[in-house]
Amino acid sequence: MASPHRLLKDYQQLLSLSQKILHLAVNGQWDTLVEQEIVYVQSVEGLVNTPIPDEIDSVMRLHLRQILQEVMDNEAKVKQLLQKRMDELSSLMGQSLKQKSINTTYNEFAGQRMLPGDALPDETRS
């Protein structure tokens, strides 16, 4: 069973990771965020498996609760930023697919007469 001091240190470390991840999301550093997310999840798993001792006083419990609330608030903000990024990427993918479709269509008609009397590209060289 973890000592109250060790438990507080672990919760503060989780909060620090949470703040770092939020900072990375705000600054659009997605690759680094993904790397840190692994460490964050491991930290959360470690805390989930660490029981809170019964002898922790109410002040310490309140402090731990406040830390957890801030971590959850940070997670909500990161989730919003991730959703915004996913929407941006989805839009970019849609634009890319439209551009590919347009390019494919133009390539299909390359070398063809589009209007009556138009010369083919090979006919203009004579």
From Swiss-Prot:
Q: Mainly resides where?
A: cytoplasm
Alphabetically ordered keywords of this record: Bacterial flagellum biogenesis, Chaperone, Cytoplasm, Repressor, Transcription, Transcription regulation
Q: Would you kindly state one Gene Ontology biological process term found in this protein's UniProt entry?
A: bacterial-type flagellum organization
- Spell out the residue ranges making up region: FliD binding: 60-98
| Region Required for homodimerization, residue ranges | 1-50
Q: Where in the cell is it found?
A: Cytoplasm, Cytosol
Entry-linked InterPro entries: FliT
Q: Does this entry carry the keyword Chaperone?
A: yes
A Gene Ontology term for the protein's cellular component: cytosol
Relate the assembly described in the record: Homodimer. Interacts with FliD and FlhC.
Indicate the family of this protein.
Belongs to the FliT family.
As for what it does, the entry says: Dual-function protein that regulates the transcription of class 2 flagellar operons and that also acts as an export chaperone for the filament-capping protein FliD. As a transcriptional regulator, acts as an anti-FlhDC factor; it directly binds FlhC, thus inhibiting the binding of the FlhC/FlhD complex to class 2 promoters, resulting in decreased expression of class 2 flagellar operons. As a chaperone, effects FliD transition to the membrane by preventing its premature polymerization, and by directing it to the export apparatus.
The name under which this protein is listed is Flagellar protein FliT
Species of origin reads Pectobacterium carotovorum subsp. carotovorum (strain PC1)
